[in-house]
Structures are given as structure tokens and as C-alpha cells.
Amino acid sequence: MSSSALSSSALSSSAPSGASPAPSPSPPGGRAVGRTDPCRIVELPEYTDPRGTLTVVECGSEIDFDIKRAYHIRDVPDGRRRGAHGHRRLRQLIIAVHGSFEVIVDDGFERDRFLLDDPGRGLYVGPMIWRDMVGFAPGTVGLWLVSEPYDEAEYYRDYDAFLHDARAAS
């Protein structure tokens, strides 16, 4: 299994449609995306024996929030994008349970992308982060563990409104 990677490649072509120009990606060794609660890869404990591998996520250990909702995404058509939104309060751990995809994160100032391709690693994404999921390999299954029940009022669906609030909060 390959490991998850972080890349600082230019992302201007990945800006949400109709959105303002994308912020510059952070330079190597630069500040992580997420001004107060940085996005980060979380290593998940794995236990392997002749019966297979068990991967664990515990509240208070691997993640510092209670899981109030979980969902998975699968069967994403080739070339399609998921996400294209931000959250006001919600925190989440995103895991590629099978296959791979990239998550582009944007806090209104910095932008980066994470490749998720190992079920033993997840991406923590905190509040006030715009996210896009792209590059789904055939057969990919992604799992989201989230801190809040679904509430449409908690979402940013408009990138310019997200940018306004994200930049005003800093």
C-alpha cells in the first residue's frame, strides 16, 4: 500500500466554478491550511493477524470530537468532483477505505491537496475549510466521520460567501 501524500502543486485550475481566484498554495515548510485548526493526516492504529487487518478510530484518541454522523461515498463517475462546500463548525475525518482520491482544502488564505490512498490514514478537516474531492479511482469507497448531525444552515455552498467570512474571521 502506498502512503498518503501532501502536495503543494499549483491549484488555480481547481478553483470552484464561478469563484474568485484561488489563494496560492502554501510553500514547502509553510503554514498548514486551517488557521486555528490545521488540516492534517491522522495515522490510524492497525492490528493485523492471520484473519486480516482491523483499523481503529477512537474518539479522544485519533480524533478529538464525538462522531455524530458517518457516511460513505462510492461509485463516483470518472472525472466527477464531490464536495465543493465548506462548514461553519463541523469537523471530520475522511478515509479512503478502498481506492484513492484527492482532497483539496482551502481556508481562504492557503490551499493544499492531500492524496488519500491508504485505509490506515485519514485526513482531519476542521471548521471553516472549503473542500473539494477529486480524482476518484474506479471502485473507491470514502468514509466520512463527522462531528455534527446534518444541518443545511451549517454549510457554505457559495465560495465567495465562504471567502468573505473566512477572511473576516482572521
Which residues make up each language-model segment?
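Well-ordered alpha/beta subsegment
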Residues: 118-123, 128-135
